[in-house]
From Swiss-Prot:
Residues 835-916 are annotated as: Three-helix bundle. The modification Phosphoserine is found at residues 267, 604, 1025, 1155. Residues 273-317 are annotated as: Responsible for slow ATPase activity. This is Unconventional myosin-VI. The gene is MYO6. GO terms for molecular function: actin binding; actin filament binding; ADP binding; ATP binding; calmodulin binding; cytoskeletal motor activity; identical protein binding; microfilament motor activity. It comes from Homo sapiens (Human).
Length: 1294
């Protein structure tokens, strides 16, 4: 198969594996892996892709691959990753794989300089290239730009963001302190906003949009940082393998003894807010020695430091202090920040116990007195006031008058703990807001022309336990994915369609329904949550039940017990829900959703903190107090500030800003879950590529044009440098002249209605045209003028040459016309005078016989004069007849009559002479004359036979044409009957198609859900749920798997088995099921037969019905296989033709989609039709114009001929005759892969006028081209299938 060419087939852990096709199934291909010879497996045909010929080759832009598909995309990234080339393009989108180690010199100052002003594609892929492209686009298009850095947690978004900022400030900064401040702001923001998670050691727990502002000279003048959704819950609690924000550990590890004493710090294990997670520091050998022993936790002393090339708590503390100094923070302000951080730690160490009195409430534990003292000291609070505010809540009643009565309500231990944590989260979040504001103050700007914004926000998150923070993060990623779909897929395709470029449509999954589920007015999850917060007694259970009730049948929402992970099935329906996101299904536990959605403190704590003695603390809360001063607290009730609504508003403002800018995308990829270098997990990387839309982009860029410019925009850019004669040009014509002057290849660009578009990888040419440097523009105008002058002279030369050619052609045609006239006149004259000429020839022959008569007479002894007289009379009669024929227009019958009379006279004379000769001589002479007459008679008979044969052939051709017309009439009559039935069927087919597309979307979502569950299972050491707990759709598809004898449940599976199981589940798609259902109605079920078995049965079976069924299935598989080859052909190559396009186009389209949507009422049963016409032999000939010549000048087209011999409904022999290459001969059996796979009815040949030819015409060409020898060799090698042709040849050979 495929001449041994390798293909990519699905693999559960590597994504794809290379193999060879060894068999073609009904809806699948049998693959033999290259590394496991002798072993085979089945793969769905639409999941198999052709592989590059050189498996070790890599390309910088995936659009340069010979085959553009997800398998070659993954393999190219893998090959480049193995060579430490972590960056790859898909057109103008950058794919960045996290290497998890430092690659030397890749981000050096020399590297920065090498990318300055360079077009995309002229240097190896790099994040610097994207940054420089954004800058050049901003400068040329006079439009602000955005760079969206996206990817999963741990994929390298934060680092790539820092490299973009560093590149812009180093390359296009003013050389002042402001450039350093923008770069140095990152360590400070990371210290307060980043933390270690399970999947990332330096995970950003907030989103930021960093704007670098430029003046009219395109120099950096300032910056601004917007931040979104700090994860406040992390301040109070973390997972076992996670840490709190870096600042806490860096302060403990790196603070001087003086600061440490002032802040009363110790090792991390002594603080509640740190010791429930990981208490180890990040350090290397040198910094480990610099950290004092009393600052190390027992866990650290036991297991040692954690290693990361980018993190070092002791060294990072020093770097953070340096950054603070560079951005303008003095020592006092620096100490203020540290003081609040330490105050939060001490606040967390305050514990409560139940009070002994009957009034209820709680008291501080004795051991917490020290922590209370430290906390009050650091935050500028009174100890007693802090104690009272944490253990009681002030309520204001209105029953006692206008001013009301103040009542202190004691809090229970749990309520006091919640109040303490709420205060800690509020203080830290206000501190973070202050840090961001302070960062923004360090690079102010008065005026700004444009900006480049870099978005770094938490990637899609899916843990074993997901809460409100993950819900908001994933909601944000849904919105960003929709923006990506709109900008790259939707808007691009709409533009292509509007401009008339004819690019094939690319389908993608629209996630609008998921976004509506979350943010829709009144019924969206965020609004339901806000409504719950406003209730007198809100609860998470009531909120969850309301979500399920209002979205009972929503496709994107389901209950936890339908999760693929067993751990989620223990969650009750009112404790969580599952949302099917674009990247997969995530189960959210709604505990604390209501609490986390409220950003307000109760009145006691808010009053306490706002009245702090410390000026810095008061300043932290002043802005918040001013913003919320209109919010009045009702008696006994907390005020409500919605976190979700605030985030939604911020997110919508961000997206509005992104939509108003030009966008560049950096897709960060996480190579493995262990966060180790040089380890490539193909399956989970493939999932990231699919979820990020890279596969859809690759499909679009096969025919896409990522760069474009308006004709008028280009024209106006060059107009002021044009001379008058150029200024009069039409903008479109000017652009055409400009491209010609630059020598651009016509395949690299395409003209739309109002814009010119450039192919992927042609960014250098595009930038050359768009470069707005005055000298450069003037130079290009000169080149355009030069090209126009040259082209006009060439036109003059061409016109002169054309006139000469035209003169010669007229002369040639005149001579040809004379020659045609001469020939026709000769033919007419010949047809008119041929009977007379033939008569003269015959009579002349008779006259020649007189010499023999004279010889006979000369030997006679008696009666010579009389005989001479008779001979003389006969000669006179002959001469008279010849003269008469020459002078008069005699018919053939008249000539024949008189000729016969002369013959009779000559015969009578001859018999008289014979009497006078001796018996022997007379007998001998008579015999000779009779022989000559017999020859003449035979010749006349042969002429008559030839004439009858020609008339018979003309009659047969007329009968064939009449038969074709009769078949055409019958077909039209049948079509009229079918139209009536088809009208009823079309509505049903439309419904079926809609249901099928919906089912396909569900299957695709199920696949993503299962892949995501598999990745969670691998990272969390969990197992996918067993069959007894699977959802209904999955149970139905897996009931054929073995069941354990002990407990009746399925055995636990490895990840590879789980992935294989999912692949088999997906193979039960609607198209496959429809095919199998159709096969079930037939007498023979051939769906499990191998391709070779079908072929052998066709060659050997005598069962006519089985033979017909096998032939039908055999050719159906050929159609599917050839459709797969056509879909996955090489880029920029024509589809190989097994028959002329007019034949294959007639019935090829349905197989490209692999969907059996043909009208069942419009088909005659193929088997019945084959039995009826089984022994019919029909021959056809039609023109064969090659694809390369399709759009050439008609006179220069190279037209060949395509011959076909159909034995019944299927092709038996095929010939291709081309003027510039040897004939191509094909016979059934030996050359099935190269021959036309359609049956006679599907080709439409019987309905093509003049296509059918006589058997003799086919056989003559077949024999002349060596077909007999070719077929004989195929028969001898047992490769030819038994057909009428093979039987006839074998009988001739015998």
């Amino acid at each position: 198969m495929e001449d041994g060419k390798p293909v990519w087939a699905p693999h559960p852990t590597d994504g794809f594996q290379m193999g060879n096709i060894v068999d073609i199934g009904p809806d699948s291909l049998t693959i033999e892996p290259l590394n496991q010879k002798g072993k085979t497996f089945l793969a769905l045909i639409n999941q198999v892709f052709p592989a590059e010929e050189d498996s070790k080759k890599d390309v910088e832009d995936n659009c340069s691959l010979m085959y553009l598909n997800e398998a070659t995309l993954l393999h190219n990234i893998k090959v480049r990753y193995s060579k430490d080339r972590i960056y790859t393009y898909v057109a103008n989108i950058l794919i960045a794989v996290n290497p998890y180690f430092d690659i030397p010199k890749i981000y050096s100052s020399e590297a920065i300089k090498s990318y300055q002003g360079k077009s995309l594609g002229t240097r190896p892929p790099h994040v610097f290239a994207i940054a420089d492209k954004a800058f050049r686009d901003m400068k040329v298009l006079k439009m602000s730009q955005s760079i969206i850095v996206s990817g999963e947690s741990g994929a390298g978004k934060t680092e790539n963001t820092k490299f973009v900022l560093r590149y812009l400030t180093e390359s296009y900064g003013t050389g002042q302190d402001i450039d350093d401040r923008i770069v140095e702001a990152n360590p400070l923001l990371e210290a307060f906003g980043n933390a270690k998670t399970v999947r990332n050691n330096n995970s950003s727990r907030f989103g930021k949009f960093v704007e670098i502002h430029f003046n009219e000279k395109s120099s950096v003048v300032g910056g601004f940082v917007s931040h979104y959704l700090l994860e406040k819950s992390r301040i109070c609690v973390q997972g076992k393998e996670e840490r709190n924000y870096h600042i806490f550990y860096r302060l403990c590890a790196g603070a001087s003894e003086d600061i440490r004493e002032k802040l009363h710090l110790s090792s991390p294990d002594n603080f509640r807010y740190l010791n429930r997670g990981c208490t180890r520091y990040f350090a290397n050998k040198e910094t480990d020695k610099q950290i004092l022993q009393n600052r190390k936790s027992p866990e650290y002393l036991k297991a040692g430091s954690m290693k990361d090339p980018l993190l070092d708590d002791h060294g990072d503390f020093i770097r953070m202090c340096t950054a603070m100094k560079k951005i303008g923070l003095d020592d006092e302000e620096k100490l203020d920040l540290f003081r609040v951080v330490a105050g939060v730690l001490h606040l967390g160490n305050i514990d409560f116990e139940e009070a002994g009195s009957t009034s209820g409430g709680c008291n501080l534990k004795n051991k917490s007195a020290q922590s209370l003292e430290y906390c009050a000291e650091l935050l500028g609070l009174d100890q007693d006031d802090l104690r009272v505010s944490l253990t009681t809540r002030v309520m204001l009643t209105t029953a006692g008058g206008t001013k009301g009565t103040v009542i202190k309500v004691p809090l229970k231990v749990e309520q006091a703990n919640n109040a303490r944590d709420a205060l800690a989260k509020t203080v830290y979040s206000h501190l973070f807001d202050h840090v961001v504001n302070r960062v923004n103050q360090c690079f102010p700007f008065e005026t700004s022309s444009y900006f480049i914004g870099v978005l770094d926000i938490a990637g899609f998150e899916y843990f074993e336990h997901n809460s409100f923070e993950q819900f908001c993060i994933n909601y944000c990623n849904e919105k960003l994915q929709q923006f990506f779909n709109e900008r790259i897929l939707k808007e691009e395709q709409e533009l292509y369609q509007k401009e008339g470029l004819g690019v094939n449509e690319v389908h993608y999954v629209d996630n609008q329904d998921c976004i509506d589920l979350i943010e829709a007015k009144l019924v969206g999850i965020l609004d339901i949550l806000d409504e719950e917060n406003r209730l007198p007694q809100p609860s998470d259970q009531h909120f969850t039940s309301a979500v399920h009730q209002k979205h009972k049948d929503h496709f994107r929402l389901t209950i936890p017990r339908k999760s693929k992970l067993a751990v989620h099935r223990n969650i009750r329906d009112d404790e969580g829900f599952i949302i099917r996101h674009f990247a997969g299904a995530v189960c959210y536990e709604t505990t604390q959703f209501v609490e986390k959605n409220n950003d307000a403190l109760h009145m006691s704590l808010e009053s306490l903190i706002c009245e702090s003695r410390d000026k810095f603390i008061r300043e932290l809360f002043e802005s918040s107090t001013n913003n919320n001063k209109d919010t009045k607290q009702k008696a006994g009730k907390l005020s409500f500030i919605s976190v979700g609504n605030k985030f939604k508003t911020q997110l919508n403002l961000l997206l509005d800003k992104l939509r108003s800018t030009g966008a560049s995308f950096i897709r960060c990829i996480k190579p493995n879950l262990k966060m180790t270098s040089h380890h490539f997990e193909g399956a989970q990387i493939l999932s990231q590529l699919q979820c990020s839309g890279m596969v859809s982009v690759l499909d679009l860029m096969q025919g896409g044009y990522p760069s474009r410019a308006s004709f008028h925009e280009l024209y106006n850019m060059y107009k002021k440098y044009m001379p008058d004669k150029l200024a009069r040009l039409d903008p479109r014509l000017f652009c055409k002249a400009l491209f010609k002057a630059l020598g651009l290849n016509e395949n690299d660009y395409k003209f739309g209605l109002t814009k010119v578009f450039f192919r992927p990888g042609k960014f250098a040419e595009f930038d050359q045209i768009m470069k707005s440097d005055p000298d450069h523009l003037a130079e290009l105008v000169k080149r355009v003028n030069h090209w126009l002058t040259c082209s006009r002279w060439k036109k003059v030369q061409w016109c002169s040459l054309s006139v000469i050619k035209l003169k010669n052609k007229i002369k040639y045609r005149a001579e040809a016309c004379i020659k045609m006239q001469k020939t026709i006149r000769m033919w007419l004259c010949k047809r008119r005078h041929k009977p007379r000429i033939d008569g003269l020839v015959k009579v002349g022959t008779l006259k020649k016989r007189l010499d023999k008569f004279n010889e006979v007479v000369s030997v006679l002894k008696d009666g010579k004069p009389e005989m001479n007289k008779q001979i003389k009379n006969l000669e006179i009669s002959i001469d008279t007849l010849m003269a008469k024929i020459k002078s008069t227009m005699m018919t053939q019958e008249q000539i024949q009559k008189e000729y016969d009379a002369l013959v009779k006279s000559s015969e009578e004379l001859l018999s008289a002479l014979q009497k006078k000769k001796q018996q022997e001589e007379e007998a001998e002479r008579l015999r000779r004359i009779q022989e000559e007459m017999e020859k003449e008679r035979k010749r006349r008979e042969e002429d008559e036979k030839r004439r009858r044969k020609e008339e018979e052939e003309r009659r047969m051709k007329l009968e064939m044409e009449a038969k074709r017309k009769q078949e055409e009439e019958e077909r039209k009559k049948r079509e009229d009957d079918e139209k009536r039935i088809q009208a009823e069927v079309e509505a049903q087919l439309a419904r079926q198609k809609e249901e099928e597309s919906q089912q396909q979307a569900v299957l695709e979502q199920e696949r993503r859900d299962r892949e995501l569950a598999l990745r969670i299972a691998q990272s969390e050491a969990e197992l996918i749920s067993d069959e007894a707990q699977a959802d209904l759709a999955l149970r139905r598809s897996l009931d054929s798997y073995p069941v354990s004898k002990n407990d009746g449940t399925r055995p636990k599976m490895t990840p590879e088995q789980m992935a294989k199981e999912m692949s088999e589940f997906l193979s039960r798609g609607p198209a496959v099921l429809a095919t199998k259902a159709a096969a079930g109605t037939k007498k023979y079920d051939l769906s499990k037969w191998k391709y070779a078995e079908l072929r052998d049965t066709i060659n050997t079976s005598c069962d006519i019905e089985l033979l017909a069924a096998c032939r039908e299935e055999f050719h159906r598989r050929l159609k599917v296989y050839h459709a797969w080859k056509s879909k996955n052909k090489k880029r920029n190559t024509e589809t190989e033709q097994r028959a002329p396009k007019s034949v294959t186009d007639y019935d090829f389209a349905p197989f490209l989609n692999n969907s059996p949507q043909q009208n069942p009422a419009a088909q005659i049963p193929a088997r019945q039709r084959e039995i009826e016409m089984n022994r019919q032999q029909r021959f056809f000939r039609i023109p064969f114009i090659r694809p390369a010549d399709q759009y050439k000048d008609p006179q220069s087209k190279k037209k060949g001929w395509w011959y076909a011999h159909f034995d019944g409904p299927w092709i038996a022999r095929q010939m291709e005759l081309h003027p510039d290459k040897p004939p191509i001969l094909l016979v059934a059996g030996k050359d099935d892969m190269e021959m036309c796979e359609l049956n006679l009815e599907e080709t439409g040949l019987t309905r093509k006028r003049g296509a059918e030819i006589l058997p003799r015409q086919f056989e003559e060409i077949w024999e002349r081209c060596g077909g007999i020898q070719y077929l004989q060799n195929a028969i001898e090698s047992r490769q030819a299938r038994p057909t009428y042709a093979t039987a006839m040849l074998q009988s001739l050979l015998k």
